[in-house]
């Protein structure tokens, strides 16, 4: 697994896990804001642009990150955060290692498996994968994701770099992930965020995560869509990180 880093001179470690189909730039604005006081690490999940290996599973990504933290930071960091697929990887990390971080942020992570969605992914991408290399098609996708316009070139470049096999693999993994029983043993102070404009499954997932983590805090973000908090409002996100750590 590869990593992008900011603020290497600082001792307190914050690790941020990007969403599926995106990359480290998901958190670039927040990372640049936080780098004065924290060492920010942005892993590039397997199977994504600039990654060093194909995607296998959410569990394997979690193991890689745990091993990285064990090797470089004596088994724990200050805060970890994850959006969507990255949020699922973080939930898996917290399930496997309950004390790996002091604080955690879960943003829009799906934990309501859908066999129907899983079954539809392969035929859907089999017919339209080739279109992602056309800007007109990519712009339609990008617009539907509600990502701020200045990130389009990053999005287009990186989606074109993801193989069909990897894209199907991580989308299928995303559609089937569910919480592990061991998540209840997590000792981190967890904050769960979801946009009010997200679909019902995502809203229900946020509630399920909140209930599974008894000491967690759940916040519904008014008028925001999937991933808008960390992607489109990086400075607000950075301020929330500071607020959480300050608690």
Q: Predicted segment positions?
A:
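Conserved alpha/beta-hydrolase catalytic His-Asp/Glu region
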Residues: 115-117, 131-184
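Short beta-strand/loop motif that positions the catalytic acidic residue
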Residues: 186, 192-194
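Flexible "cap/lid" loop of the alpha/beta hydrolase fold
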Residues: 95, 101-131
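Active-site loop/oxyanion-hole signature of alpha/beta-hydrolase fold enzymes
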Residues: 41-81
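Catalytic histidine-centered segment of alpha/beta-hydrolase-like enzymes
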Residues: 224-235
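Conserved HGGG/HGGXW glycine-rich cap/lid loop of the alpha/beta-hydrolase fold
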Residues: 6-50
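Gly/Ala-rich beta-loop-alpha elbow adjacent to hydrolase catalytic centers
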Residues: 82-86, 90
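Conserved alpha/beta-hydrolase "acid-adjacent" motif
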Residues: 199-205
